[in-house]
Amino acid sequence: MNPPISVFFLTSEVLPVVKTGGLADVSAALPAALSELADEEIDIRVGTVAFRGVESLPGFSLTKTFVARTPAGALTIRIFEGRLGKGNVPVYAVDPEGLFDRHGLYGEDGGEYSDNLERFSLWNHALLHLPAVVGYSPDIIHANDWQTALSIPLFPHVIRPKIQTKPHRSVISIHNMAFQGVYPLSQWHWTGLPPAYNSFDGLEFHGRLSLLKGGIQFADLVTTVSPGYREEVLSEPGGCGLSGALSHRQDRFVGLLNGIDDREWDPASDPFLAVHFSGSNPDPKDLLKERMRKEWGFSQGRRRPLFGVVSRMAHQKGLDLLAETLLSMGEKGDLGGEWVVLGSGDLHLEGLWRTLQALFPDQIHLRIGFDEPLAHRIIGAADFLVVPSVYEPCGLTQMYGMRYGTLPVVNPTGGLRDTVADGKTGIWMEELSENGIKNAIFKARTLYLEGHEIKEMRIRAMAVDSSWKNRAREYIRVYRRLMETPPWHNPLE
């Protein structure tokens, strides 16, 4: 048995407290998977925001109140505690005087709250006081994205001297380089960091401050969510202005694939599916397709592939180019098959897809919004799942598709390239363009109509182990190597 290890996992989103994207899924699944490794003794605890309504969540209750000194002075901090997964992972939802009691987590109506630097900085200060309050001394602080990146320089140089905890290591995981927490230097005081950190070797970023840069500069280890994305962000434009900082940390920068919750996403037991199937018995999947086609009013009698899209409607996801491609294909009378689309986001894109549905009502069915049961049903019923992302740090949808024998049709960027094998478990687009998307759609249709090969590919895709249990072992190995490695040298010392 390896020696025990303790990890304080910091995240702005975790199910069931709050979710705006995939970070919430990762933050729930990875700690749970780590805690359930039978041959490892790991004390992992999650620190997150006390989002509106947390006190009403089953299993969550107010357990502690304390006062923390912050850049805003003395704040009264409330801790709502709950549990995750079979391992009963403690989750601390931290409330710095109601700063997250709002309709949105980051903003409303497509805009960001003007006081986000204040909110997230004060929350980071409160989070880092929490271990001493609950009697917890972590070996590793694992931050995620810009929202918790401030904790990396803050803990050793501001908080630890006050609470005198043991030496620790720090990790910053980057889920998407496009979101960096960039704010005016005039708001620097909210960080609580010494003036020396307001420099090129610190958080200064083109005349502003970048919270994510601070995490990159001072963490003992930087990770991102796939090996392919790691390579892309080491140069521009993938690095979004921070490729230099990442290149400086290359020897302490690794790509670790995300996983999926293979209990929640299991076609053999999924409660949202009317019929269940598996790799050893895949045929009932066809019944789900026919149910969906009838339910959504597709014309009966023709044998055509069903393409699914389950995505945020954003330029990053390539939904604008896909819509333009389908418009062009539709004008020539051939969409390649039938389409079921679920998503929401950019209002212009939502309008574009509504226009497409109006033009081709017999071939495209659209649902605007977030609907978890419907997402399961589409992925269970479709023949192909189209993922035309401009860039994709890791992506989860394609792994859900493979788990359900729904072959991903992807632009091979970042984690899509790492997880989908062209011609074996999915189809790669030759390029991200109208022609590239159209050719991949027609290739998928040919595969479907020929019949034999698609069955083999489905079974092969369903056999791929993308579970968090499998991925968690990689994280354990990284954590243990990190504890054996000297701390990263602070460039400001």
What are these regions (language model features)?
Residues 1-493:
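Catalytic cores of nucleotide-sugar-dependent glycosyltransferases that transfer UDP/GDP/TDP-activated
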